[in-house]
């Protein structure tokens, strides 16, 4: 029995959510394996219900599958029940679309969304039947590439990852695919050296690292790695058709990036630092993307994504026009957490004309002292005023994000979170 038949007939009937592993979602891409030259697995080291909503994976999936000679498939971290069955049977981790073992791919691309997924990456490599360490892999093994926010500090995963994409991956992923396409018969070393010549690609094997007597780690890089940056969001590739699952997701909606980067300097915010400079997408492009997404997916909610949506230069116009477009399809518009010191309540009112979901704010700290430490410049009265106005306009649910463990934090700062919420 081949792996596909084994998975469909004997393995998936034994797990609680088999629809997550079928690979037959609406807009999933299937190609003839004999008609492509390069096979890629885009691997997300978290559960399907979290990973399918990741916009970065949607973008890379669309970019690679537009190449006629490339087929990009997907794999997600197996849930405990599936992992137990795979281990018991000695079955390797497989791609969703074709049920091919990951070890048979030309390259595997991991999205490192956060440092907490590092161990899941190692587990997926192990479940694929591949050596964990990069220097133990042979010519026949796939090249393992990683990108995303967690790749900005590659050292913790350097022993296990062959190459890191530092920065935006929309352009780099095509260059990597073209590079490996031309070296399918090449040695592993030839592939790594070729990847190491690409802008924004860090190959640990090409960099010498030593530990001095005083314990300091020093590096002798072959060349300086410059972070890749997409400068024109209107010209940047985006998915023409989002994957629409048959299983329930944590965030069951489509996302459209309206802006990258952030003009604020919150001192705890990794995304605000690594996403610079600020870049915006035009309203015309956003409306076109909304129209295509609603028409091709049937999603009932579109999220306008950015680190601070209220700082979009034409925010009022954008929110009003987005709400009107969504209303035509009986859909909702949402935005991520909003900054209290820049939030205009009328923006929320504009999108609430379709369907009020909830408002999310990010105070992060509950005392003036700790807010000053992290550069969050607002007071309690601002929070109460904004929430009160939102409730008067019909919003019924408000969520606030707070952080515990910030530098200089005291017990008083933590207790103030509960006190502020009660008030």
Regions found by a protein language model. Name each.
Residues 1-17, 67:
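Helix-enriched interaction subdomains in cytosolic or periplasmic regions
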Residues 48-51, 80-83, 116-118, 151-154, ...:
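Flexible loop/turn segments at secondary-structure boundaries
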Residues 42-46, 64, 243-267, 294, ...:
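N-terminal pre-triad scaffold of radical SAM enzymes
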Residues 269-285:
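Iron-sulfur (Fe-S) cluster-binding segments and ferredoxin-like electron-carrier domains
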Residues 11-41, 48-49, 204, 210-255:
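N-terminal [4Fe-4S]-dependent radical SAM core
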Residues 43, 292-399, 403-423:
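Conserved SAM/AdoMet-binding glycine-rich loop
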Residues 40, 44-45, 51-62, 66-73, ...:
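Low-complexity, highly charged intrinsically disordered N-terminal segments
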Residues 77-219:
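Glycine-rich beta-alpha loop elements in corrinoid/cobalamin-binding modules
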């Amino acid at each position: 029995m081949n792996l596909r038949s084994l998975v469909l007939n004997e393995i998936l009937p034994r797990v609680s959510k088999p629809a997550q592993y079928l690979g037959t979602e609406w807009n999933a891409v299937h190609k003839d394996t004999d008609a492509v030259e390069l096979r890629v697995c885009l691997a997300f080291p978290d559960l399907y219900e979290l990973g399918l909503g990741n916009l970065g994976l949607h973008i890379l999936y669309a970019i690679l599958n537009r190449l006629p000679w490339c087929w990009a498939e997907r794999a997600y971290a197996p849930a405990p029940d599936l992992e137990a069955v795979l281990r018991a049977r000695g079955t390797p981790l497989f791609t969703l679309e074709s049920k091919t073992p990951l070890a048979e791919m030309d390259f595997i691309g991991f999205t490192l969304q956060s440092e907490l997924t590092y161990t899941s990456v190692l587990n997926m490599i192990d479940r694929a039947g591949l050596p964990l360490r990069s220097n133990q892999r042979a010519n026949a093994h796939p090249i393992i590439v990683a990108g995303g926010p967690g790749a900005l500090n590659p050292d913790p995963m350097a022993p296990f990852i062959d190459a890191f994409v530092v920065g935006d991956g929309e352009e780099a992923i095509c260059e990597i695919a073209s590079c490996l396409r031309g070296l399918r018969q090449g040695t592993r070393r030839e592939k790594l050296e070729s990847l190491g010549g690409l802008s924004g690609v860090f190959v640990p094997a090409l960099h010498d690292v030593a530990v001095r007597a005083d314990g300091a780690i020093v590096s002798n890089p072959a060349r300086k790695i410059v972070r890749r940056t997409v400068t024109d969001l209107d010209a940047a590739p985006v998915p023409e058709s989002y994957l629409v699952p048959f299983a329930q997701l944590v965030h069951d909606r489509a996302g459209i990036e309206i802006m990258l980067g952030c003009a604020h300097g919150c001192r705890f915010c990794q995304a605000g630092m690594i996403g610079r400079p600020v870049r915006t997408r035009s309203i015309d492009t956003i409306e076109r993307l909304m129209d295509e997404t609603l028409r091709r997916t049937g999603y009932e909610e579109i999220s306008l994504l950015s680190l601070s949506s209220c700082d979009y230069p034409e925010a009022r116009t954008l929110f009003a026009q987005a709400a009107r477009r969504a209303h035509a399809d009986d859909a909702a518009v949402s935005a991520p957490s909003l900054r209290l010191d820049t939030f205009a309540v009328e923006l929320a009112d504009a999108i609430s004309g379709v369907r009020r979901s909830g408002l999310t704010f990010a105070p992060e700290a509950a005392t003036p002292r700790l807010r000053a430490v992290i550069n969050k410049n607002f007071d309690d009265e601002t929070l109460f005023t904004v929430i009160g106005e939102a409730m008067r306009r019909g919003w019924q649910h408000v969520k606030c994000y707070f952080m515990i463990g910030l530098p200089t934090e005291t017990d008083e700062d933590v207790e103030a979170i509960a006190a502020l919420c009660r008030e």
